[in-house]
Regions:
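Short glycine-centered segments of the SAM/dcSAM-binding site in methyltransferase folds
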Residues: 51, 75, 146-148
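A short acidic, Gly/Pro-enriched loop at the edge of an enzyme's catalytic core
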Residues: 109-120
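A short glycine-rich, Lys/Arg-flanked "PGG" loop and its adjoining helix->strand segment in the class I
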Residues: 133-145
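Class I SAM-dependent methyltransferase SAM/SAH-binding core
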Residues: 53-55, 59-110
Length: 216
């Protein structure tokens, strides 16, 4: 996929529907490891009782960390447009008997959440969504002052290892949808100062922005 092209939502969901049952087995091919997910959830700085939204929750790979962070008094709202991916997430919720996880099949760009949010997570989804800025805007409107948006994703932009990592990124985009040249920090800067940390030789990053007490 090119640096500016995004696949339409229907095409993206079709791809994920096809691989949903095998997604966990495919994660090593994408160099996705539990420490990356834990790092993203930790960056949300959630407290027990918090309400958190995950945009592009997929099969629910982040749910154990999110549920642990908010505790039994908190709530996790997990959104994805793929029926197949959410079906796998529902199996996980059933096995773990989580009563505080709500799964929603929605287009994130049109999402309307009816609760105030203490955190919003885009984990490996911001570079895939056809309209990520719209999804961010809708989520931001429901965030409490002091709440955080965290974007964890893969990308080649602004990394000194860009030339070395380019073949890996091209392979990843062949295996699944996504724009390795996505710049989520440009969208996030509309809302405040952005903190960015890179890891795994700069291939992955975590971006954080905090909603000010004024609510701006």
């Amino acid at each position: 996929m090119g640096s500016s092209a995004r696949e339409p939502l229907q095409a993206i969901t079709a791809q994920y529907d096809r691989v949903a049952r095998f997604y966990a087995l495919m994660e090593p091919l994408f160099l996705i490891f539990p420490p990356a997910r834990r790092k993203a959830v930790a960056a949300l700085d959630l407290s027990p009782g918090a309400v958190v939204l995950e945009v592009g929750a997929g099969t629910g790979r982040n749910l154990p960390y999110l549920v642990d962070a908010v505790g039994p008094a908190g709530a996790v709202i997990a959104v994805d447009a793929s029926k197949g991916m959410l079906a796998e997430a529902q199996k996980l919720v059933g096995r773990r008997k989580w009563s505080n996880v709500q799964l929603l099949r929605e287009d994130a760009a049109k999402l309307r959440v009816d609760r105030e949010l203490d955190g919003v997570l885009f984990s490996l989804s911001y570079s895939v969504l056809p309209e990520p800025a719209a999804a961010l805007e809708h989520a931001w409107e429901k965030m409490r002052p002091g709440a955080r948006v965290v974007v964890m994703d893969v990308g080649l932009t602004d990394t000194r290892f860009r030339q070395v990592l380019a073949p890996i990124a091209r392979l990843l985009t062949k295996l699944g949808p996504g724009d390795p040249y996505s710049r989520p920090w440009d969208d996030l800067r509309r809302y405040g100062s952005v903190g960015t940390e890179r890891f795994l030789f700069g291939l992955y990053y975590v971006c954080v922005v905090v909603k000010s007490e004024s609510g701006a």
